[in-house]
């Protein structure tokens, strides 16, 4: 049996303001820092250790990972950063308030943008400063791979190959792997591992700052998964994510 641990970054400044974030490179909030520190302490208390870590190129995931590893005295392990683990790109919605968009477009439309599998948000123009092609960190990424917006289906299409090509080989080598990522890049992995339908993944909310453990068999199929948190705490955190369309 193999194990892999995933964690969604701690609360970001834009999570706190209830804004669509996507690839916008915002920092952790004070609460997000506390969540990451708590996660690191929890993993250490539960006896976890890691040989290698993977994260995105966005600072909220990178800083979460750094804080977790610091609490575990594992600052020295190899860390691989890749844009394919980035959050889903929310296109023209990035920087807009979720509750205000609900008032403007209706709850059903915003739920489709946030939680459906194959409905993308409104796209950016390439002249928009929010387009990743205008950010030097993506200079080596082929232009046709840089999104103007993404559905969860699009996100899965870029995340799963990275999982298969980079993360799975490390797991099969017997390395203890930690992934620090984002709500939708994690939902993409969860959907793939658990063979969930679009309807099932639409109901799945990933809370910030709580380690999610997957136990995998020799074929990298899930045996079981669980969060390192008690049920009441977990439910409250999941409900926070679900309620974002109402909170200004």
Curated annotation (Swiss-Prot):
**Pfam entry (one):** His_Phos_1
As recorded in UniProt, its EC number(s) are 5.4.2.11
Set out the biological process GO terms recorded for this chain's protein: gluconeogenesis; glycolytic process
Keywords from UniProt, A to Z, are: Gluconeogenesis, Glycolysis, Isomerase
Write out the residues that bind substrate: 8-15, 21-22, 60, 87-90, 98, 114-115, 183-184
List of catalytic residues: 9 (tele-phosphohistidine intermediate), 87 (proton donor/acceptor)
Q: Which CDD domains match?
A: HP_PGM_like (cd07067)
Q: Per its UniProt record, what InterPro entries does this chain match?
A: His_Pase_superF_clade-1, His_PPase_superfam, PG/BPGM_mutase_AS, Phosphogly_mut1
**Residues carrying the site annotation Transition state stabilizer:** 182
Kindly list the residue ranges recorded as spanning the membrane: none
Note whether Membrane occurs among the keywords.
no
Task: Give the Gene Ontology MF terms in alphabetical order.
Answer: phosphoglycerate mutase activity
Q: In which pathway does it act?
A: Carbohydrate degradation; glycolysis; pyruvate from D-glyceraldehyde 3-phosphate: step 3/5
Record keyword Transferase present: no
User: What is the reaction catalyzed?
Assistant: (2R)-2-phosphoglycerate = (2R)-3-phosphoglycerate
Q: Which NCBIfam families match?
A: pgm_1 (TIGR01258), PRK14115.1 (NF010713)
Protein name as catalogued: 2,3-bisphosphoglycerate-dependent phosphoglycerate mutase
Gene name as annotated? gpmA
């Amino acid at each position: 049996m193999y194990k892999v641990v995933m964690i969604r970054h701690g609360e970001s400044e834009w999570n706190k303001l209830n804004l669509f974030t996507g690839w916008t490179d915002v920092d952790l909030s004070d609460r997000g820092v506390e969540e990451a520190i708590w996660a690191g302490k929890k993993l250490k208390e539960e006896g976890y250790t890691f040989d290698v870590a993977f994260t995105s190129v966005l600072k909220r995931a990178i800083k979460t990972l750094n804080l977790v590893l610091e609490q575990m005295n594992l600052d020295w392990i190899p860390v691989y950063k890749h844009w394919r683990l980035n959050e889903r790109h929310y296109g023209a919605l990035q920087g807009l308030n979720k509750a205000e968009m609900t008032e403007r477009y209706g709850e059903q439309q915003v739920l489709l943008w946030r939680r459906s599998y194959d409905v993308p948000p409104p796209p950016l123009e390439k002249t928009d400063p929010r387009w990743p092609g205008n950010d030097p960190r993506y200079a080596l990424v082929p232009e046709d791979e840089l999104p103007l917006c993404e559905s969860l289906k699009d996100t899965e299409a870029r995340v799963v190959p990275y999982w298969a090509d980079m993360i799975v080989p490390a797991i099969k080598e017997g390395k203890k792997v930690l992934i620090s990522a984002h709500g939708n890049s994690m939902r993409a992995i969860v959907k793939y591992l658990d063979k969930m339908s679009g309807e099932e993944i639409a109901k799945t909310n990933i809370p910030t700052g709580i380690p999610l453990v997957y136990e995998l068999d020799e074929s990298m199929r899930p045996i079981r998964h669980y969060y390192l948190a008690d049920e009441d705490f977990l439910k409250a955190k999941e409900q926070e994510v679900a309620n974002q369309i109402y909170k200004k």
